[in-house]
């Protein structure tokens, strides 16, 4: 019929019935997608730029094989490769703080989508994605695990399952104010794998929201390796480098 227009796709219908807006300021999303920031808020994010350190995924422009922080850690990191999306500063720092401490779990999904957009070309091939778990006491207080939400968004984009294969069996308290040695000691025996048959010989992408020294990810990766994982790669949305 001559009066018919072009077909309306799902995104256009969503725009009609549920107007999309930047989850931070309410402005117009950069590309009209759900979970997307506006142009101004995106400008406040510092995306990590290569070359990248293979040990932690952070920026590394020196002539050495890894960044000084990873070299000083020696063989304490238990993973096979690392990817990071953002520097822990500016808008990403604000988003993570609001997510974790102001009860806004939806922001973790925003971060997950942005992180995939930033690092999709660096993500390794994996059989599944595993979020770093919270201890039940912290989960009870916060009500959600931000790393789980980030991992779920990566799962959607990468087309591989997100599986809860790790359990945090020991409460470790706050890590943020501890030095490297204290962090490592604090995390000893903190993680376990309840069913090793789900891990054996699989390549796993281990996901956390922030990496500082890498102690939490190292302890979690070690538990997966001991349970028989073929390879463990780590992904953090934000990298806090001390150099």
Predicted segments with their positions:
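Glycine-rich phosphate/pyrophosphate-handling loop used in enzymes and phosphotransfer proteins
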Residues: 1-207, 212-243
